[in-house]
Amino acid sequence: MPTAQINGHTMYYEIHGQGDPAICMGGWGTFCHGGERNLARGLTDRYSVLLIDYRGIGESDDDLSVAPSMTLFADDVIGLLDHLGWTNVHFIGLVGMGACISQRVAIARPDLVRSMVNMGAWARCDDFLRDQLEMFGTVHRDSGFEAFQKFVTVMSFLPEYYNENKNKLLGPNGGWKELNGHYEAHARFIEACINHDVWDELQHVQCPTLVIHAGQDLVTSPRTTEPLERLIPGAEGVTMEDVAHVVAGKDQKIRFCNILLPWLEQH
């Protein structure tokens, strides 16, 4: 499987599909190693989609002497795109960290970003979001991965979906499994997320941008995503009123695809 020496670490990546270049990044996990099945249906039919393991999880290593920041993770992506010779890439950033990385790349290297989609994102942390993110880390550190997994899962899915799918959401093959046994990587993700602040820089984003607001999100609610729509020049916004932090279930996934794919085609 492909790896490259990027920005002082070994970076694992996969490319799925054929077509114009796109990159899809999520939160504290990866779409690699079979996770591509969670991509928007039809995305890899139309695009060459780059997926990565963030430093410290999966098959990517990390240099713990380097302080974590969203700029560091963005520089990893920039280095990999330069390594691949990719420019003019559709950036799809979902469920937190991937969206924030996309913002940083769009600001630093506009030549790389053809368009940007943000969902579950923020321009900077308020006290509420900061304390939530810190609590996720505290639970993982003090009570273990299983307690963290249950905590973050009940915060990320609608009650009805959780009740019907609890057995597949939890456990060794459940959500956030990449963090199991990797508390230090998780802590570094949290530090980067908490310190992310592009409030005064988003005015420099040049690419077409779509911000998707999740009306039932308990972590990155419209409180944190609506400022992105206001601060990014020309940004468009769409609200999915009944969606929590994670798009889940057949109906939600179809509606998400029906928002995402036509918008990408227009840009």
Go through each PLM region and give its residues.
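Acidic beta-to-alpha connecting loop that harbors the catalytic carboxylate
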Residues: 28, 215-217, 242-244
